[in-house]
């Protein structure tokens, strides 16, 4: 870096600092103070610089000394390497000169080994027989010692042959043939150990020393295996039969004994007992719990700690049980067997009844995982739901058909507190509730899936039910003499539909998780379906009643009507007769039918009023108005009598009096009366009003239309529209007045 440039930058920085310090006149008095402070700072920086430079120089000095030492070491190493190279030039000559000595050393080593093993070489057969006898007499430690002596002799001799520069295969074959019975003894001892270990749990209860002896032998063989493998890495020689891996053998034997124990627990098949799976699983639970208790209390003290025998046994039982149950699942389950299997796998097995029992305290999920693989468990759940769905479909199809057949019988429906009903709704939801209670013992997600599926099936049942109800109605109205108790069964259908809605809502309260929003549309669809059935059936009740009154509605606002009250009297008597049956409706349904009956009666009466059957002068219209109001009041009194507990405020029957009042109004003030009326009933149209004033022959239709149009143009939209306004939307005439 340019020193002059640095100096210039420092100078500029100093000038800038001075300018900042001497901005006010009063600061000139502190110039001497600033100068001393900067001088001290400069001295401090110079001292730091000198210290840094000194440190750098010391480092360089030390580095140079180390380089000098390294150079000296390199020269010394080079000198000694030259000396070693000079000495090694004579080694080949010495090696050739010692060839005879090496041969003699090899022979001496072989002879020494042979001398050490002469007893075993010449007494192989006797030693083998002795060892076999010891095995038969269960003197396993002595037998193993004899076997070890024989194997050591054979292995030492084979190792001497292995060390020879010129190896002859025939020598090895001869030696191995001489000791071939040793392998037979080893195999016999292994069989004996397998037999003992296959009965480990039973033996531990009676004589644990037998197991301890077997484990001591296995541990010795494990050490011999390790030594042989280590020797192979150094010399390349591995004795015959090594490694024996008897520890792995013992684990295989124990695992096989566990599998045999599990498979041997099955006592019955499905053909023998319907509860075979429940009994089988309970027996397995008891066996596994007792066996693992024995393992923890008796095996753990006998086995070496590094075997982790309790953990191994837990794994063996887990794997064996998993395979056993998987085979049962693959062979196919039926009915409640699905629930028994899933509940046992998800709750009983990992719970306090088995693995989490205080005597065992095994954390299955953390240590060994699930008993059935998640995909297998999900497949099991899907099969269970499919099976449940098939059962629901079959039962609900039969239920719908049974209900349909009952409608055509000549027996009155059952009553519950005077209300007609059938048992189908309760049975359907009891069946669903039973299934959901069962799935709740497994896990909530399965319960939710079962609930959604149940709702979907009930909705399908509802669609079939609605179709049958429509067919019933059409069949009845083609010939009303065919079905004797049509009204009674329609009442039953209304009550059943309401009960289905209530039971569905109760089911939702019990089982629908508050946090779940998916599939909620299925539940809403179910409610809508049965509300629709309820509404249809209620309308059929009134349709039948009003069909009987059709001719009397046709007599309204005719000359016959003016002369007598027969038409209205008959209408009231007919309704009263039908409402005697309607008392078998549940209170909510009765109120709905009452409201619909008022609405329908008002609509039919107003339609007759607007049907152009009368045309009278202004003087006679007052009497007509009074008669209309009297009949409207009579209708209201009739409904108050048959339904005293139901409020009739804002009744659609009030529309009759409201319209009749227009017949007596001054035609000049009609626009004012229409303002309020049209604001409350916007569906009241020009055609309706013109037809109403047809009764007054002193008013021309054109004049009425003009005033109605004026009222409609000047009317203001009201905040509140009367709820009975919809009646006018349903009154439509095909004939035109102009």
From Swiss-Prot:
Pfam families: Sec6. Gene3D superfamilies: 1.10.357.50, Exocyst complex component Sec6, C-terminal domain. Residues 28-91 form a coiled coil. GO terms for cellular component: cytoplasm; exocyst; membrane; presynapse; rhabdomere; zonula adherens. Keywords: Coiled coil, Exocytosis, Protein transport, Transport. GO terms for molecular function: SNARE binding. Disulfide bonds: none annotated. GO terms for biological process: border follicle cell migration; endocytic recycling; exocyst localization; exocytosis; follicle cell of egg chamber development; Golgi to plasma membrane protein transport; neurotransmitter secretion; plasma membrane organization. The exocyst complex is composed of Sec3/Exoc1, Sec5/Exoc2, Sec6/Exoc3, Sec8/Exoc4, Sec10/Exoc5, Sec15/Exoc6, Exo70/Exoc7 and Exo84/Exoc8. Component of the exocyst complex involved in the docking of exocytic vesicles with fusion sites on the plasma membrane. Belongs to the SEC6 family. This is Exocyst complex component 3. The lineage of its organism: Eukaryota, Metazoa, Ecdysozoa, Arthropoda, Hexapoda. The gene is Sec6.
């Amino acid at each position: 870096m340019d020193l002059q440039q640095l100096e210039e930058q420092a100078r500029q920085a100093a000038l800038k600092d001075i300018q900042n310090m001497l901005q006010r006149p009063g600061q000139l008095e502190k110039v001497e103070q600033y100068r001393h402070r900067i001088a001290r700072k400069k001295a401090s920086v110079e001292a730091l610089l000198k210290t840094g430079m000194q440190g750098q120089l010391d480092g360089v000095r030390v580095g140079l000394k180390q380089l000098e030492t390294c150079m000296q070491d390199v020269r010394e190493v080079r000198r000694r390497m030259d000396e070693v190279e000079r000495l090694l030039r004579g080694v080949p000559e010495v090696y050739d000169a010692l060839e005879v000595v090496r041969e003699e050393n090899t022979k001496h080593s072989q002879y020494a080994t042979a001398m050490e093993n002469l007893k075993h070489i010449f007494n192989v057969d006797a030693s083998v027989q002795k060892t076999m006898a010891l095995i038969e007499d269960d003197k396993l430690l002595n037998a193993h010692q004899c076997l070890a002596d024989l194997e050591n002799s054979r292995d030492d001799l084979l190792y001497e042959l292995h060390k020879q520069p010129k190896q002859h295969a025939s020598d090895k074959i001869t030696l191995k043939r001489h000791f071939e019975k040793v392998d037979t003894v080893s195999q016999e001892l292994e069989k004996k150990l397998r037999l003992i270990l296959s009965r480990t749990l039973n033996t531990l209860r009676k004589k644990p020393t037998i197991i301890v002896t077997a484990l001591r032998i296995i541990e010795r063989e494990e050490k011999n295996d390790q030594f042989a493998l280590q020797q192979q890495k150094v010399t390349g020689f591995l004795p015959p039969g090594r490694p024996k891996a008897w520890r792995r053998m013992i684990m295989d034997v124990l695992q096989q004994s566990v599998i045999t124990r599990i498979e041997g627990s099955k006592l019955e098949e499905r053909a023998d007992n319907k509860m075979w799976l429940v009994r089988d699983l309970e027996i397995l639970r008891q066996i596994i719990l007792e066996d693992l208790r024995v393992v923890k209390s008796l095996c753990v003290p006998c086995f070496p700690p590094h075997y982790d025998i309790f953990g191994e046994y837990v794994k063996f039982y887990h794997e064996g049980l998993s395979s056993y149950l998987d085979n049962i699942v693959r062979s196919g389950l039926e009915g409640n067997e699905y629930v028994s299997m899933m509940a046992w796998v998800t709750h009983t097995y990992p719970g306090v009844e088995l693995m989490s029992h205080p005597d065992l305290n095994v954390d299955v999920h953390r240590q060994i995982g699930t008993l059935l693989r998640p995909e297998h468990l999900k497949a099991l759940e899907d099969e269970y739901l499919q099976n449940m769905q098939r059962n629901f479909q079959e039962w609900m199809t039969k239920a719908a058909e049974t209900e349909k057949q009952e409608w055509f019988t000549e027996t009155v429906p059952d009553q519950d507190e005077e209300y007609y009903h059938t048992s189908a709704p309760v049975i359907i939801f009891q069946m669903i509730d039973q299934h959901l209670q069962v799935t709740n013992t497994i896990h909530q997600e399965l319960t939710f899936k079962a609930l959604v599926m149940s709702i979907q099936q009930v909705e399908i049942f509802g669609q079939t039910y609605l179709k049958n109800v429509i067919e019933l109605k059409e069949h009845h109205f083609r010939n009303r003499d065919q079905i004797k108790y049509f009204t009674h069964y329609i009442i039953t259908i209304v009550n059943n539909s309401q009960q289905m809605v209530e039971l569905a809502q109760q089911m939702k309260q019990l089982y629908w998780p508050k946090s779940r929003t998916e599939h909620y549309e299925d539940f809403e669809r179910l409610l809508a379906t049965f509300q629709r059935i309820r509404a249809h059936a209620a309308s059929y009740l009134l349709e039948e009643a009003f069909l009987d009154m059709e001719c009397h509605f046709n007599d309204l606002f005719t000359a016959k009507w003016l002369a007598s009250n027969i038409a209205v009297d008959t209408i009231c008597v007919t309704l009263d007769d039908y409402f005697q049956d309607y008392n078998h409706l549940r209170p909510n349904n009765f109120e709905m039918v009452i409201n619909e009956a008022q609405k329908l009666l008002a609509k039919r009466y107003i339609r007759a009023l607007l049907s152009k059957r009368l045309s009278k002068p202004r003087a006679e219209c007052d009497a007509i108005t009074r008669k209309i109001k009297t009949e409207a009041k009579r209708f209201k009194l009739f409904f108050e009598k048959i339904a005293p507990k139901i409020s009739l405020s804002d009744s659609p029957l009030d529309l009759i009096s409201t319209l009749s009042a227009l017949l007596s109004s001054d035609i000049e003030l009609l626009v004012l009366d229409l303002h309020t009326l049209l604001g409350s009933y916007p569906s009241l149209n020009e055609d309706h009003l013109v037809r109403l004033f047809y009764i007054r022959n002193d008013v021309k239709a054109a004049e009425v239309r003009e005033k109605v149009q004026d009222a409609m143009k000047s009317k203001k939209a009201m905040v509140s529209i009367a709820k009975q306004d919809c009646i006018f939307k349903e009154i439509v005439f095909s004939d035109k007045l102009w």
